Amino acid sequence: DTNVIVSAMLKWDSIPGSILELALDGPITPVLNHEILEEYRQVLLRPKFHLTERIVGDLLDNISSRAVFADAHKLMLELPDPKDVVFYEVTMEQRKTEDTYLVTGNLKHFPSEHFVVTPRQMLDIIVNNEK
């Protein structure tokens, strides 16, 4: 979700940075919709992050070019942050046809499910699948 993207952009040499790199040029296929892209854009352009429109635009263009766009069906779900619901909805929609994970730095914000994982857990899953 958004915190992984922000963490990656603030510190590329990090586990979230590795996740983003794998999403841009590796085995991770981002699952998005336009609401998620707009959330990324709004958050990344906050002045405190010091990211330019060009940097954010290029990043989102690159993510979009590798992504699967899923039309999320609304779920009756209450989460601590209402803006997180769309990430869960898109994940659930894509899970109907593919093995899909929701990667977040805030596990406590989502239902406890085997497919809701931290960036570290996602890296472990990828490494184990490559063996």
What are the language-model segments listed below?
Residues D1-T2, L32-N33, N106:
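A secondary-structure boundary/capping signal
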Residues F49-H50:
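Membrane interface segments of multi-pass transport proteins and intramembrane proteases
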Residues K96-K131:
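Acidic, PIN/NYN-like endoribonuclease modules and their adjacent C-terminal/linker elements
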Residues V4-I5, I36, F87, K108-H109:
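Alpha-helix capping/helix-boundary segments
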